[in-house]
Each structure stands twice: as structure tokens, then as C-alpha cells.
Regions:
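A "functional boundary" signal
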Residues: 1-223
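Alpha-helical transmembrane signal-anchor helices
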Residues: 218-258
Length: 258
């Protein structure tokens, strides 16, 4: 029964990120939580927190609906924390994230900095912690720190072959804002490939919209470079003709002098 319940919880999470919100909610609501063991209760709250968080992303720009699902995710996380062993990696990650959601940025940064100092970049928690630290840096206006932590998070995602990611997408957007179109274009292409492979429709519209903007600017930049290259080629061709003409003229003058 516990294996079946775990499967249904994970299925609900996957359904939510794939856009099947009603199916995900029905799956969760059909699960009988009475008699759950401590471990299964922890899995339940972790799954519902993740599911509500994914659902909230669909309502970005619609404050009332976003706040509803976001608050449900935060509430599920508060229920999750007491079920986790204190001091464990999962506990510290969720504690730091909860501090962040409650806008206690200093406490969140303290917990998460301690966490990434003791775990390896190959640990999936490392990427999540670094992404939150990047968001904290962004709230403080520290762009360099934000880029640094987004890069660490993206590298960790790549090492773990994690396809459902946000760090490389955000990093691409940030580099675009700073005028680094080539790297922004490359990173967003990787991000869209990951989105397609993971079937994470919640990320699809965000990444596609950003990629279209960068693609447009990138194409314009490439067109400018091509025009400049044509101008240089024409200029060099004219210089070559002038050089040939000058050599011919000098030879003619030398023959006349001789």
C-alpha cells in the first residue's frame, strides 16, 4: 500500500508540472492519509508542496490565484518540516526555502549557505539551494552574486541530468539583459530542449517567450555582423583593385624611365 501511495503522490506531482492540474488534484484528494507512517506523511507533504508550487507557476501575473496556490505550498512545507529529521539535508533545504518564502532572507541565506558548504554539487539539493540563494541575491540587487549562484545551480542540474530546471533559463535571461546575446541564446536553447524532454508545460511558455525575444535580437545582431562582413569584403576588394592598379602604374612608369 505504501508503494502504491508513493507512486500516486509522485504521479500527482508529475501531472501538475505537465499541466494536468485537475487530474493531479483529484489524485491527491483520493488518497486516504489516515494511518500514514512518519515517512509516508513526509512524502505526502513534500509532494503536495511541490504540486501546489507547480500549480502556482501557471498563475504568474494573476496575483489572487497565484497567492492562493503559493500559500498552500508554503503551508504544506510548514507541515513537512516537523516530519523531517532535524539537521538533515532535506530539513535544512526546506527550512531555508520556508524562510525565503516568509521573506526572512538573512536567515534563509544563512541556512542554505551552510547546506551547500557540506553537500556535493552532485546532490540535487545543491541546485535548489543555489537557486534560492540566487533569488535572495536578486532581491538585494546583487547581480554578480545572482549570476554566480545561478551558474552553480545550472552546473549542478547538468551534472545530475535534471531536465526540469529554471536556473539555466533565468541565467540566459539575465545574460540577455546584460547584452551577452550569444551565451543567452545558447543557454536558452539548452533550456528549451530540457523543457521539451521533461514535458514540463509550466516552463514551456516562459522559456519559449524569452527565447523568442533573444532569438529575434540574436538574429538582428547576426544580420548586422553579416552586413559588416560584406562591407569589409567589398572594401578589401576595392583595396586589392587599387593595389593592382598602383603596381601596374608603377611598372609602367619604370618602363618609361628605363
Amino acid at each position: 500500500d505504501s508503494l502504491e501511495t508513493e507512486f500516486r503522490l509522485r504521479r500527482a506531482t508529475y501531472l501538475s508540472i505537465s499541466g494536468y492540474i485537475h487530474d493531479a488534484l483529484n489524485e491527491i484528494n483520493d488518497i486516504d492519509t489516515t494511518g500514514f507512517s512518519q515517512g509516508l506523511r513526509s512524502t505526502y507533504y513534500a509532494a503536495t508542496r511541490q504540486m501546489y508550487s507547480y500549480i502556482s507557476f501557471y498563475y504568474e501575473g494573476h496575483e489572487r490565484h497565484f497567492d492562493k496556490w503559493h500559500n498552500m505550498a508554503v503551508d504544506a512545507q510548514k507541515h513537512l518540516l516537523p516530519t523531517l529529521p532535524k539537521g538533515s539535508d532535506a530539513y535544512m533545504l526546506n527550512l531555508g526555502e520556508n524562510y525565503y518564502y516568509c521573506r526572512e532572507y538573512a536567515r534563509s541565506a544563512e541556512v542554505l549557505t551552510e547546506l551547500i558548504a557540506r553537500i556535493e554539487p552532485q546532490n540535487p539539493d545543491y541546485a535548489i539551494a543555489c537557486h534560492i540563494l540566487a533569488s535572495i541575491a536578486g532581491s538585494r540587487g546583487d547581480i554578480n552574486a545572482r549570476i554566480y549562484y545561478l551558474a552553480l545551480s545550472a552546473i549542478s542540474d547538468l551534472r545530475n541530468a535534471t531536465l526540469e530546471v529554471t536556473s539555466i533559463q533565468e541565467l540566459g535571461g539575465l545574460l540577455y539583459e546584460r547584452g551577452d546575446l550569444d551565451r543567452a541564446h545558447n543557454y536558452l536553447n539548452v533550456a528549451i530542449d530540457n523543457v521539451v524532454q521533461s514535458r514540463a508545460s509550466v516552463r514551456m511558455s516562459q522559456t519559449t517567450e524569452l527565447l523568442n525575444i533573444v532569438e529575434s535580437h540574436h538574429n538582428r545582431q547576426m544580420a548586422q555582423w553579416r552586413r559588416l562582413l560584406y562591407v569589409i569584403i567589398v572594401f578589401l576588394f576595392i583595396c586589392l583593385i587599387a593595389l593592382v592598379a598602383a603596381i601596374w602604374y608603377l611598372k609602367r612608369q619604370l618602363r618609361q624611365v628605363a
